[in-house]
Swiss-Prot record:
Function (record text): Transcription repressor. Involved in the development of the forebrain region.
Organism in which the protein naturally occurs: Xenopus laevis
Keywords tagged on the record: Developmental protein, Differentiation, DNA-binding, Metal-binding, Neurogenesis, Nucleus, Repeat, Repressor, Transcription, Transcription regulation, Zinc, Zinc-finger
Gene giving rise to this polypeptide: fezf1
Positions of the UniProt region annotated as Disordered: 446-466
SMART domains the UniProt entry points to: ZnF_C2H2 (SM00355)
Gene Ontology process terms (BP): cell differentiation; nervous system development; regulation of transcription by RNA polymerase II
PROSITE patterns named among the record's database cross-references: ZINC_FINGER_C2H2_1, ZINC_FINGER_C2H2_2
Pfam family, one: zf-C2H2_6
GO cellular component, one term: nucleus
Protein family: Belongs to the krueppel C2H2-type zinc-finger protein family.
Residue ranges covered by zinc fingers (C2H2-type): 261-283, 289-311, 317-339, 345-367, 373-395, 401-424
Leader sequence residues: none
Subcellular location: Nucleus
Protein name as it appears in the record: Fez family zinc finger protein 1
Length: 466
């Protein structure tokens, strides 16, 4: 009877002690700042850690006068599986100790390390402490399933050893959290690290961290991959999952070269088949995207959308020398070459210079003698397909651009402008007029120097712009 009562009393006391230990543990973790991820969720999915007794590993030989209150960890055990969770701590004045001092401190019996001393102990242990003194390599580091890397540093994390590289990174002025648990176990991420970054009071204990060999970063892992990453080591995971690596990682496998798509005509190389498809109209001359206002054709739909701004009469970019306005700043920059007399594109056949590369390419087609685009009605051939498109308006009697002075119609806006400059440049009969002309079409004033004339545009075509 007495023995059973004593056994039950001992069981109750042990249960209370375990609850108090768990309460102290949660209090220590809850002292940190609010995290970007839920610690409770991480701890609920993480297996209960087993304890590995380490005799006098975390004992310090620090002088008694140099002691300051800080976060103290029980020196009797180190968790075998430690989650990558930031832990709150207080600063202490001690910065670092050498390997000899560390070995000496392990012999002496002194109060336990504070947080920074414990961290420096782990750093030195990774460097020159005898590997046989503590078999850490057989224990695995467990990571959380959800990690927000940017939010982690935004909270004021002291350091981050994950793929830090060789960049000079300085911690913020006030540091109150850091993932110190990640340095205690033999993490397979760093089999032969050069040095680690550890920040204490805005000072770098070591300059850099060796990059992760396979180039895996937080953004490269999906949530499913990250869960798998916890259960299996990165070595076994790298054999099953192909990560997105860049050229800056020298250890990338030769078999992970990106696919290339080569143009059979000019030999130009592209990294995607879509880019090759967009390139092919350069050789075929196809311009499937045609402006319904002026009939000009384009190879890409995005270029057509930019072209439609021309017909909206919005030209905020003005030339300081002649006052001519443009709808795009790039067009204004090209226009300034006219005043400077700069013609960088020179034809190698006739020596004619051009301000724009597009005009230079169109001019070169006149020397080739190849007119592969022919009209099915009159068999007239053209160098480019959009010229054939304009020509087809002559057979359909579609001339949307009409001169208000003489009533002559044109298929293209460019032809109307040229007609006005040659014949009606000095005529001001219709200057400043708006409304409906003699043909009953809507009038749009010319935006350039031919402001005394108007472009007569069909209402049906004008509606198709918007």
């Amino acid at each position: 009877m007495d023995s059973s009562l004593q056994h039950s009393t001992t069981k109750i006391l042990s249960t209370q002690e375990s609850r108090e230990a768990l309460s102290n543990r949660l209090t220590m973790i809850s002292g940190a700042k609010p995290l970007a991820f839920s610690i409770e969720r991480i701890m609920s999915r993480t297996p209960e850690p087993k304890c590995l007794p380490v005799a006098s590993l975390l004992q310090s030989s620090a002088p008694k006068g140099d002691q300051k209150p800080g976060l103290h960890i029980n020196s009797s055990s180190i968790p075998r599986m430690i989650p990558f969770v930031p832990v709150a701590y207080e600063h202490c004045a001690k910065i670092g100790i050498s390997g000899a001092e560390l070995r000496k401190s392990h012999v002496d019996s002194s109060p336990p390390f504070s947080c920074s001393d414990l961290l420096n102990c782990a750093l030195t242990l990774k460097g020159d402490f005898p590997r046989e003194a503590l078999p850490l390599q057989q224990y695995k580091l467990v990571r959380p399933r959800v990690v927000n890397h940017s939010s982690f540093h935004a909270m004021g994390a002291a350091f981050c050893y994950f793929n830090r590289g060789d960049s000079e990174w300085h911690p913020p002025a006030s540091i109150n959290i850091h993932p110190m648990a990640s340095y205690f176990l033999g993490s397979p991420l760093h089999q032969a690290p050069k040095c680690y970054v550890a920040a204490e009071r805005n000072k770098l204990l070591a300059p850099s961290v060796e990059k992760f060999p396979s180039g895996v970063t937080f953004k490269d892992l999906s949530q499913a991959q990250f869960q798998h990453y916890m259960k299996e080591g990165p070595r076994s995971l790298s054999d099953k999952i192909t990560f997105k690596t860049s050229a800056k990682f020298s250890s990338a496998s030769p078999s992970s070269k990106p696919k290339v798509f080569t143009c059979e005509v000019c030999g130009k190389v592209f990294n995607a088949h879509y880019n090759l498809t967009r390139h092919m109209p350069v050789h075929t001359g196809a311009r499937p995207f045609v402006c319904k206002i002026c009939g000009k054709g384009f190879r890409q739909a995005s270029t057509l959308c930019r072209h439609k701004i021309i017909h909206t009469q919005e030209k905020p970019h003005k030339c300081n020398q002649c006052g001519k306005a443009f709808n795009r700043s790039s067009t204004l920059n090209t226009h300034t070459r006219i005043h400077a007399g700069y013609k960088p594109f020179v034809c190698e056949f006739c020596g004619k210079g051009f301000h724009q590369k597009g005009n230079y390419k169109n001019h070169k087609l006149t020397h080739s003698g190849e007119k592969q685009f022919k009209c099915n009605i009159c068999n007239k051939a053209f160098h480019q397909i959009y010229n054939l498109t304009f020509h087809m308006h002559t057979h359909n009697d579609k001339k949307p651009f009409t001169c208000p002075t003489c009533g002559k119609g044109f298929c293209r806006n460019f032809d109307l402008k040229k007609h006005v400059r040659k014949l009606h440049d000095n005529s001001g009969s219709s200057a400043g007029t708006r409304g409906l002309g003699a043909t009953g079409h809507q009038e749009l004033h010319l935006p350039n120097r031919e402001q005394s004339h108007t472009i007569i545009q069909s209402p049906q075509l004008q509606k198709s712009v918007y």
